Amino acid sequence: MSDLDAVLARVDADLDASLERLFALLRIPSVSTDPAFADQCVACADHLAADLKSIGFDAARRDTIGHPMVVAHGGPKPGSGAGPHVLFYGHYDVQPPDPLEKWESGPFEPRIVETPAGKRIVARGSSDDKGQLMTFVEACRAWKKVA
């Protein structure tokens, strides 16, 4: 089995735990355009930094004049030599969920729904951009476990 096959198998095996981590992130109402949610943006950045640290990255929240960002670095395994460099970018902030009456459930209470096209996750930020961001984190988590 190639390293890539092993990583993909690990991603599949860890799907339920990965979804729980994504749902925890989606529950944080990190609305960047509303000053009332500034503390939630900080909480979301701290959450991401802690998650990245849990898989071996040197990660930290960096405060800015606006909302904080998260920077993480991780080197190759000791003794493995120099590895490839990977950079990913995403954002943890979301747009306001208004109008609330358009939501069938709370915008920060993620759920999986069946559609004619298959299952999908419904929550503010699930596709822009917390879902994409967590695909990067989960891929790194799987790679670090098996490669």
For the regions a protein language model found, what residue spans apply to each?
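Active-site metal-coordination/substrate-binding segment of hydrolases
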Residues: 82-147
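N-terminal helical capping/dimerization or prosegment-like subdomains
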Residues: 2-100
